[in-house]
Amino acid sequence: MASDTPESLMALCTDFCLRNLDGTLGYLLDKETLRLHPDIFLPSEICDRLVNEYVELVNAACNFEPHESFFSLFSDPRSTRLTRIHLREDLVQDQDLEAIRKQDLVELYLTNCEKLSAKSLQTLRSFSHTLVSLSLFGCTNIFYEEENPGGCEDEYLVNPTCQVLVKDFTFEGFSRLRFLNLGRMIDWVPVESLLRPLNSLAALDLSGIQTSDAAFLTQWKDSLVSLVLYNMDLSDDHIRVIVQLHKLRHLDISRDRLSSYYKFKLTREVLSLFVQKLGNLMSLDISGHMILENCSISKMEEEAGQTSIEPSKSSIIPFRALKRPLQFLGLFENSLCRLTHIPAYKVSGDKNEEQVLNAIEAYTEHRPEITSRAINLLFDIARIERCNQLLRALKLVITALKCHKYDRNIQVTGSAALFYLTNSEYRSEQSVKLRRQVIQVVLNGMESYQEVTVQRNCCLTLCNFGIPEELEFQYRRVNELLLSILNPTRQDESIQRIAVHLCNALVCQVDNDHKEAVGKMGFVVTMLKLIQKKLLDKICDQVMEFSWSALWNITDETPDNCEMFLNFNGMKLFLDCLKEFPEKQELHRNMLGLLGNVAEVKELRPQLMTSQFISVFSNLLESKADGIEVSYNACGVLSHIMFDGPEAWGVCEPQREEVEERMWAAIQSWDINSRRNINYRSFEPILRLLPQGISPVSQHWATWALYNLVSVYPDKYCPLLIKEGGMPLLRDIIKMATARQETKEMARKVIEHCSNFKEENMDTSR
């Protein structure tokens, strides 16, 4: 099972400081600009962590607000020292790098920072004397500067500008630079001249860059240990250059087989060259390549027995010449991954769960197009088979969703995989901490990607969690998201149905403060709009029934929500639904349950005192819908109205006495052993009807309700009745002159039931 170990003190302090910057590390100058407190000095370990966690929070936590001048906290290396920072996405702009230009950075990773322009190239020079590792992956605009010549016009722009490619920048002066990633740069950046000043490169990533002449790579043949040429259109000339790089330990010439057509085919001869010439090779990625058949032995020829990673037994013929198994071999979407004997400790591929997880792990950061397809394979494994490495799978999917929250394919496949990876079959293997991470990443997806499939998958995944208890730590956020999804203009019925179900569950077992807060978010109004839309369409489906059920739950002992229901035309919708759907029993039960909550609020009862409403409630006393539920709830509504006394009876028809008689008749017709579709959290609204003589029928209804519940569900309701002080009130009824004899008899039976229960469950242990 996953560990539930608490967060480290460092992690908690870092998070707190970042969420309270102007109250901890800094202060606001001119109400806008952050400045570090003058008495603070932070070492590089803390500064690096603050920056990297800040980036993580901005990109992964939608409830975290970035601060425009955050990086100004680190402008002075005498008080704050940065050495290794990883920045990503649109969070980072030119002025942010400019703010930290005095720092002696050793490692700077900029990933998909598309807002960086050529201004940042000049800032990079500030780090040239210390920088060892640099990544500009996906920073597609960093080699552009903006100009606004008179001849450049664009009627759609307020300030027309032209982007001009900077061609004179080189890495001159970056004498310590060893690791460089230029992946996903634009094609016409002059790579050769750009890199020429670097004398001792050890690692180079040119993913997605097309160059017909790779001869310039040989200048690092004695130093280059890692070369990534993902999605480069290779030729035999490229291969001739690569095999001269005899120090290589990691070579990646993989490609995305769906992105475009590549003429180059991997042959047995090419693989043999790699093995012969690159004697230090430990990692090779040839994913996505078309492999000619002569590279492997046939299934018939493969040695029987246990799978082996020994090169001598390799099913891939050229790899039999390896001196030792590879640490990693990338074979995703490559037919070789399905062979039996592969000489590598770790293989990415699509043959089985292990290979698929290796693929997700290897490609998540920089190759979302590959990762989404790997996650789709994991989805099939979790759906059809059983996931044997659940915790690893969950963590990898969470990481991918965090890393690519605006990538549709990742969000669709990732949210679908999470649905299967969090179902009840795997529940015992997951810690509270891990399940909370899933919830947060699901909510991030719902918040940042307004797409039907993603929203549906996320809602379905939330259904796998205990509601409301597992969602309580994000309670407000969940409700806000669900209410936004339930905008009636949306046409997707399946999402509406799931979202209403979730809303209903979220307000079913929470305290009144939560219900009031959700009511103020627009919960009541949203449900009423859904009901109104269904009425117009003359449809009574699960959305309609769940909406009334949700209103029943959210109005329970919550007067403000009850008032909101009345103010927003709730009673008209009740009457219209009753008329339009006379045979829908569950609908009637939910509506009457809700009106029972409204009737419990003394200040609102006058609004129910109309001839039309009283007649409807009286007629429903004779309803046999859903057992006794509709009749019982109608009688409950009338019992609270009767409790206000004859002087509050403001209608001529029907007469109070006539309604009383119908209530007595209804109560006498009910089976005391009826099993109930109801859940009382408190008896307080019922108990307040006991100590009074103004309405004996209300007193009788309340006593009958208690008798039924303690008889059928003694374990639940006997303790509740005793706890809430019901026993003395029942004893008082027996002494009351105004109480009916049958009411007194019923009160005795309730007391007897609870007394027997108390004796049977008395703890006699010493």
Swiss-Prot record:
Residues with PTM N-acetylalanine: A2
Pfam families, per database record: LRR_Zer-1, ZER1-like_2nd
GO biological process per UniProt: positive regulation of proteasomal ubiquitin-dependent protein catabolic process; protein quality control for misfolded or incompletely synthesized proteins
The organism of origin for this protein: Pongo abelii (Sumatran orangutan)
GO cellular component, one term: Cul2-RING ubiquitin ligase complex
SS bond list: none
Ranges of the ARM repeats in the UniProt entry: 427-467, 511-556, 558-600, 602-643, 714-756
Name of protein: Protein zer-1 homolog
